[in-house]
């Protein structure tokens, strides 16, 4: 039978193999080995350099086994803490997302919703009151639109009068203005008896009861002031002028007229002072006209 490999005569002896194994162990542990043959020393130095090149950093910088175990345990503990912190952060973020979504649902709750009680408890009372008023006003406005569509103009007018007073209680300006615009539009439809009527440009922003002056565009009649009663001075002027015109005047006598618009002018000679004449019939108990005073001609 043919044998493969080296023949038995070519195999090294066991003691040489043992010596080589001991040499490799000594080089691995960086132990100093002395050889009698210089060639063996050179070979040992070459193998030691090769060992140092393969081990980087060098073996002198390697840590001990205890230090390696301590570093491994510290790394594992740090990874566990990091995982716990990430889990805590994730749970907090999930809770915030849930709360924010729930808060948004509560904030958007309206009267009649399941969460409206919680909405009323969390938010201010004015907003809750506005929600109730707006909901009631919109329901009444929808009823008014139905009355207009059916031609019930009188009922729609009465309902609009009630809604107009209710809208003013809304504290939110934007929501109140929206309701006012709807009320004005329905007022226009009721006044014109036209379900398809629209708001006229320049219509008032505040709602008024249908048919009232504030909600109509008909021009108002001009205001006529009552005549003022004549003053005593003006009543005395006709009697004085009548007395002067009826009295015979000579040709040489110049007619003198006192102008009421210039009271500061001095009377000419022969004129009559109005203050000396009686003012009206109330000062004459007999009810007769005042006696005429003769005017002497001027020379």
Curated annotation (Swiss-Prot):
InterPro entries named among the record's database cross-references: RsdA_SigD-bd (IPR031928)
Residues covered by region (Disordered): 187-299
Cytoplasmic-side segments: 1-85
Keywords tagged on the record: Cell membrane, Membrane, Transcription, Transcription regulation, Transmembrane, Transmembrane helix
Disulfide bonds: none
Any one Gene Ontology cellular component term annotated for this protein: extracellular region
Modified how: The cytosolic fragment (residues 1-94) in both free and SigD-associated form, is degraded by a ClpP1-ClpP2-ClpX complex, as would be expected after S1P and S2P intramembrane proteolysis. This releases SigD so that it may bind to the RNA polymerase catalytic core.
Membrane topology recorded in Swiss-Prot or TrEMBL: Single-pass membrane protein
Iron as UniProt keyword: no
Bias-annotated ranges (Low complexity): 201-212, 250-271
Triggers of expression: Positively regulated by alternative sigma factor SigD.
Oligomer and partners: Interacts with ECF RNA polymerase sigma factor SigD; this should inhibit the interaction of SigD with the RNA polymerase catalytic core.
Swiss-Prot/TrEMBL domain comment: The cytosolic domain interacts with ECF sigma factor SigD.
Protein's name according to its UniProt entry: Anti-sigma-D factor RsdA
Organism encoding this protein: Mycobacterium tuberculosis (strain ATCC 25618 / H37Rv)
Encoding gene per record: rsdA
């Amino acid at each position: 039978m043919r044998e493969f490999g080296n023949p038995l005569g070519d195999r090294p002896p066991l003691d040489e193999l043992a010596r080589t194994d001991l040499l490799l162990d000594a080089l691995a542990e960086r132990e100093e080995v002395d050889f009698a043959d210089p060639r063996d020393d050179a070979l040992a130095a070459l193998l030691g350099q090769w060992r140092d090149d393969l081990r980087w950093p060098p073996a002198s910088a390697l840590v001990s086994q205890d230090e390696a175990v301590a570093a491994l345990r510290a790394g594992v503990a740090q990874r566990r803490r990091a995982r716990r912190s990430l889990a805590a952060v994730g749970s907090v973020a999930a809770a915030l997302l849930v709360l924010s979504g729930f808060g948004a649902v509560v904030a958007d709750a309206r009267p009649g919703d399941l969460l409206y009680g919680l909405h009323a408890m969390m938010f201010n009372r004015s907003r809750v009151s506005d929600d109730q008023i707006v909901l009631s006003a919109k329901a009444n406005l929808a009823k008014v639109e139905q009355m207009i569509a059916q031609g019930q103009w009188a009922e729609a007018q009465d309902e609009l009068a009630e809604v107009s007073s209710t809208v003013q209680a809304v504290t939110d300006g934007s929501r109140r203005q929206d309701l006012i615009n709807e009320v004005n539009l329905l007022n226009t439809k009721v006044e014109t008896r036209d379900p398809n009527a629209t708001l006229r440009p320049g219509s008032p922003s505040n709602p008024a009861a249908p048919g009232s002056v504030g909600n109509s565009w008909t021009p108002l009649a001009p205001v006529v002031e009552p005549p003022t009663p004549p003053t005593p001075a003006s009543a005395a002027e006709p009697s004085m002028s009548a007395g002067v015109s009826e009295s015979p005047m000579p040709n040489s006598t110049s007619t003198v007229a006192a102008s009421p618009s210039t009271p500061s002018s001095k009377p000419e000679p022969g004129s009559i002072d109005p203050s000396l004449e009686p003012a009206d019939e109330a000062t004459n108990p007999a009810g007769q006209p005042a006696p005429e005073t003769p005017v002497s001609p001027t020379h």
